[in-house]
Every structure is written in structure tokens, then in C-alpha cells.
Amino acid sequence: MKIDIIISADDIKKEKILHKSVIVVDMLRATSVIITAINNGCREVIPVLTIEEALEIYHKNREKYVMGGERKALKIEGFHCSNSPLEYSRQVVENKTLVITTSNGTKAIKGSIMAKNILIGALINADEVANRSINLNNDVVIVNAGTCGQFSIDDFICSGYMINCVIKKIKVDLTDIARTALYIYEQNPDIITFIKKASHYKRIKKLKLYDDLEYCCRKDIIKIVPEYIDGIIKCNKLIY
């Protein structure tokens, strides 16, 4: 197995992901939201690029859907939930379909459709993502959502931790960028302290979303790996 990293949704190229397993990472906060929602009984998640798409789906069956997401880290007017994973409790999402649109995460997911498999990853399920990627036995590309097309420290160190989880189990080849992410994690295992330097972290902190930051920086608290297949994110727990 070989592991590579793409540093933002804007840098995804078909030839880099074709026939490979992609792990999409937007730990602050879209992939953390998706993982949490499904873990709390959400039936499935539909990621879309625009607010208009989300509203169109929602109006087809208002009882079935919950709308979530953000623009510039803020809740979208008229949506049920923001991009805070802590809002997606069992009471809110159980047996519902979540329609989500975010600035970076949903773009990274939709941009990865040429991959063989698309796994949804974050710190909160990193070790389980490592297990799933090993079982799939393909080369792996970790797609960092980034922030508005730019590199994000938070996604990068999360990728480093995922690589750390993999290399504890099997031997892998790493590209230079993947090796760099691993090195950064190994030098900074206290992730929440390290990412205080990140611009995206500072933006979320400015909004006083301290609990979100603490939650998203917890390692391996969820044991599922949602997968994006044919426009829908689900988790078949029987395969793990």
C-alpha cells in the first residue's frame, strides 16, 4: 500500500485518485459532523455543493430530512443545524436523512467521485479508518478539504495521525508529503495544542465554539467508517 495526501479540495486531480481509496478529511468540522450524525442513528447523509440543492431536496419530504451545514463557519439561515457535530444528537438525527452543504468538506467529497472508494475520516474515527483502508487493500489518498482552497494545518496533522495508525499495523510506502504529515504528528501528538496555530482553528475559536474544537480533537472515540457511494454517505456496520 502507498499513501499520498492532497492538501485541499481545489487540488484534487482525477489521475491522483483513480483506482485508489480516498479518505476525505475535514476535521474542523464537516467530516466530524457526518461521522457523529451517522453514529447517532442518522440513516444516511447527502452532501451537496449549494444551499439551493439542499433546499430542493428538503422540500421533497420535510419529515424525512434534516438540513445542516455552514457558510464561513456560520449556520445557514433556515437550516436545522450548523456545522457543529454536537448539534447532531440522536434526538435530532435518528432515522433521518441529513442533507449537508459546507464551504470545504462537501466540495472535497464530491470532488473525489473518481476514486475506487471514498471513506469519511476525522480524528474521532481515525483508527477505524486505518483498519478499513487496510482491508480495502488499495493505494490510499488522504484528501484534505483545506480552507477555501488553501492548506489547513488541522486536516494535515489529522492525516498524519491516520498514517500513524496504519503503520502500526502494516508496512506502507509514503510519498514525501505523507511522510511530512506523519513527522508533524509524531512531533506534536497533542493535536489540540498544535492546531491552535491554525487559521481555521482561530476562526472557530473566535465564534466561541470551544466545545466543538475539543470534541473534534479527540482521537478514536467512534468506531464506524461512513462511505460515500452513488451520491449518498452510509455506514454498513457489518463490514467492520
Curated annotation (Swiss-Prot):
EC number of this enzyme: 3.1.3.71
Enzyme superclass (EC): hydrolase
Cofactor(s) recorded in Swiss-Prot or TrEMBL: Mg(2+)
Pfam families per record: 2-ph_phosp
The keyword Ion transport appears for this protein: no
Matches recorded under InterPro entries: ComB-like, ComB-like_sf
Reaction catalysis annotation: (2R)-O-phospho-3-sulfolactate + H2O = (2R)-3-sulfolactate + phosphate
Alphabetical keyword list: Hydrolase, Magnesium
Signal peptide annotation: none
Gene Ontology terms for molecular function: 2-phosphosulfolactate phosphatase activity; magnesium ion binding; sulfopyruvate decarboxylase activity
Family: Belongs to the ComB family.
PANTHER family the record matches: 2-PHOSPHOSULFOLACTATE PHOSPHATASE-RELATED
Protein name, as recorded: Probable 2-phosphosulfolactate phosphatase
Source organism phylogeny: Bacteria, Bacillati, Bacillota, Clostridia, Eubacteriales
Gene name in the database record: comB
